[in-house]
Amino acid sequence: MSSSDIFDVLNIKQKSSSPNAASPSVPASGKSSKPQLTGMQRELYNLLGENEAPVVVQSMNRFKEKLASNAKPTPWSLANFKANEYLTLQHWVKGSRELIGEEPQESEFKKYDVHLTIPEFTEDEYNSFIPTSNAEENEKQNIGEKVEANGDSTDVNMTEEDTNDKVKESVPQDENKSTSDNKKNNEKWEYNEVKYLFDLCKKYDLRWFVIQDRYDYENSNRTLEDLKSKFYEVSKCYFKAKKPDDPMLQSLNYSKDKETQRKKYLERLLARSAAEIAEEEALIIESRKFEMAAKKTLAERETLLRLLDSPQSDISVAQYLTSNGMSQLYNSLLADKSRKRKIDSAVPENPWMKQQHQFAQQRQQMQQLQQKKLEKHDASATPGPATTVTATETSTNVTSAGSIPSGLQSPKKTKRQKLELQTALKRKSESEYAEQLLKIFNMDERKSLGVIAHGEKLSPGVFLRSAKITTFKPAIQNKIISTAQELGIPARPVMPTFEVVTEYEALLKKIATLLDIKKQIDKIEAGKQITK
């Protein structure tokens, strides 16, 4: 479909009245010929009509422009170089032949061809430092034999059964010693073989598997461990003869028995069957389960110990019964929720260590009291100048008691314990002050009149004593009420006097602790049944 067809469909008149008047072969003189466009199909280009194409992508294949430089090119020449003492190679070098010269140069990469420093020695040197090491080993063996002989002489007074048992045990030991001696005799090394081993180590840079593969000295069957042990033994003797106090001698220790045992263990590990591997994996999973259960029980035990050791809260609930108190409680809870919690990573206190510290404190206090009593008795028995002596003794005792470690005097207390101690001291002082005011009343008069010395600050206004009974969480509260009903105790005391309310609160707290202990015991028994 051409552009004229589209104009006919859309009823658009073309600008030229006679389109076929001008022949396509004769171009107009005034108009320039359009360049032939590539990258677009002819039919699509004809649809554009007289309008020009917006953007036409034309592929222009161009090579990189030639670098215009007037510099003279540097010559390169093929020169010889020494790869090693026995091999000469060629490579291209920047520069002319006159500058390089005809003699082969050393390679630039020779500095990277680094080898290990293996000790070298002659036969005389080898015979000089090897017998000294053998003599030291013989002396150690003689000392061990003497110690064993002394031990045998001390054990003369033994029964016949013990001697028979020792003889039975010594027989395999003697057999093992004889086999080891035979092995040592069979493993004798000469200088030529040692020199051959050190040459291989120097050639292959202590690559032991390659050394064992290339090792072929008079058809000797040496294992990898034999080669290693001999190499490190001779190296240690060599460096020890040169510098006996060298701290690096410990790095040349090599245990052949441990290495063979390690390889045996590894072979046994790799030779396991699929059933054995599955059984081991099952055992590992079970052990991890036991570890997780043990950690969980330890955490629960710690929480239980904290619960038993922590003091019971005596805060009254009456301040939260009003609307103002409820709003304050709501705001404090919101602030507490928005505050970031610090992770308490401290190790929990061990109750047994705490008890031991308390026992140590009590023991020290008892000793101090006994010393004071003795000093008083001595002072009453010897009046006069002896009193000065007792005073000095008491001062020395006080100083000695003060020099006791702080860990035994008083264990470290947390912030919470310090605050509780401060509040307890404050209440005690307030109660003592109230007792001073109520000295004029007897106990009977106090009971009859209902006069009580409160240690804590009371909330203003009139309130019921039964409203001040401490409450617990809903789940715990329901359990406490059900246990109290089983025991025949009402949910609220009938006559809520001061003494009845205090005893009732103590009873509720005891029931709560017993319920928590029962819960922990049930968990422990369930864990025991699972382990069985």
Curated annotation (Swiss-Prot):
- Compositionally biased region (Basic and acidic residues): 137-149, 164-184
Which parts pass through the membrane?
Answer: none
SUPFAM superfamilies recorded for this chain?
Homeodomain-like
| Domain named SANT: residues | 181-235
Gene3D superfamilies in the cross-refs: Homeodomain-like
Pfam entry (one): SANT_DAMP1_like
Q: Where is the composition biased (Polar residues)?
A: 30-39, 402-411
Superkingdom, natural source: Eukaryota
Q: What ranges does the record list as Low complexity composition bias?
A: 16-29, 380-401
Q: Name one GO molecular function term.
A: transcription corepressor activity
* GO-annotated cellular components: NuA4 histone acetyltransferase complex; Swr1 complex
Chief place of localization: nucleus
The protein's location, in the record's own words, is: Nucleus
The Gene Ontology biological process annotation of the record reads:
chromatin remodeling; chromosome organization; DNA repair; negative regulation of transcription by RNA polymerase II
Would the keyword Nucleotide-binding turn up in this protein's UniProt record?
no
Question: What are the boundaries of the region Disordered?
Answer: 13-39, 132-184, 363-417
Q: Which UniProt keywords apply?
A: Activator, Chromatin regulator, DNA damage, DNA repair, Nucleus, Transcription, Transcription regulation
Q: Give the family, as the similarity comment puts it.
A: Belongs to the SWC4 family.
Q: How does it assemble?
A: Component of the SWR1 chromatin-remodeling complex and of the NuA4 histone acetyltransferase complex.
Q: What does this protein do?
A: Component of the SWR1 complex which mediates the ATP-dependent exchange of histone H2A for the H2A variant HZT1 leading to transcriptional regulation of selected genes by chromatin remodeling. Component of the NuA4 histone acetyltransferase complex which is involved in transcriptional activation of selected genes principally by acetylation of nucleosomal histone H4 and H2A. The NuA4 complex is also involved in DNA repair.
Q: What is this protein called?
A: SWR1-complex protein 4
Q: Which species expresses this protein natively?
A: Candida glabrata (strain ATCC 2001 / BCRC 20586 / JCM 3761 / NBRC 0622 / NRRL Y-65 / CBS 138)
